[in-house]
């Protein structure tokens, strides 16, 4: 009975964050299959140690496991690379006017390419903050750095993104 209760608690507190976990894993690994494998491995690790999880936000705890699993996989493979933006992967399907959709699609591709091109330590904090909307404190817990480091990495990531997006815009401008 205790196992059933723990399984139900795990599903309620951890598995509800699978989308966020996959999103982070996808950005860190750059590949769908690697992200799926990392999330699956992270779920197994999380379940194995779930009874010892106390105090910390279940989402932050699980995302830390996902991040570490991804980093372990990247270290093992030494073949980290980034795919070009793909609508199926990122779900950017627009159904408004064709011209507006084309501009938005182009902007989304530019933004995703710029995020994918960021160094890992900047990419992970920008994804956790801007896409997953986590608090700075939670990001620090996930990444394993102090709050000030999270803030400085976010500032640098935003600055790099802004400069890269402006450079792309200038290259495209007639």
Label for each model-derived stretch:
Residues 1-10, 104, 137, 141-144, ...:
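C-terminal edge and immediately downstream basic/flexible tail or linker adjoining helix-turn-helix-like DNA-binding
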Residues 1-23, 33-36:
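A short, charge-rich alpha-helical start-of-domain segment used by transcription regulators
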Residues 12, 80, 88-116:
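Acidic, proline/glycine-rich intrinsically disordered inter-domain spacer in sigma factors
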Residues 13, 17, 21, 42, ...:
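Residue-level preference for hydrophobic side chains embedded in well-ordered alpha helices
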Residues 31, 135, 144-149:
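Helix-turn-helix DNA-binding motif, specifically the short coil turn and the N-cap/start of the second
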Residues 37-44, 48, 56-68:
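Structural recognition of an alpha-helix C-terminal capping motif at a helix-to-coil junction
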Residues 64-85, 104, 166-167:
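Arg/Lys-rich amphipathic alpha helix in sigma70-family domain 2
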Residues 125-129:
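A short pre-motif secondary-structure segment
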């Amino acid at each position: 009975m205790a196992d059933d209760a723990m399984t139900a608690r795990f599903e309620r507190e951890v598995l509800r964050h699978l989308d966020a976990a996959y999103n982070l894993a996808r950005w860190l690994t750059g590949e769908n299959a690697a992200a799926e494998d990392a999330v699956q491995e992270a779920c197994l690790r999380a379940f194995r140690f779930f009874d010892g999880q106390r105090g910390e936000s279940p989402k932050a705890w699980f995302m830390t496991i996902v991040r570490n699993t991804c980093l372990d996989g990247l270290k093992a493979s030494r073949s980290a690379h980034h795919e070009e933006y793909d609508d199926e992967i990122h779900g950017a399907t627009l159904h408004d006017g064709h011209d507006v959709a084309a501009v938005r699609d182009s902007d989304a591709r530019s933004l995703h390419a710029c995020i994918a091109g960021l160094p890992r330590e900047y990419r992970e904090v920008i994804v956790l903050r801007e896409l997953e909307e986590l608090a700075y404190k939670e990001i620090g817990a996930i990444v394993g750095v102090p709050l000030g480091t999270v803030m400085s990495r976010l500032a640098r990531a935003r600055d790099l993104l802004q400069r890269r997006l402006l450079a792309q815009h200038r290259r495209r401008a007639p």
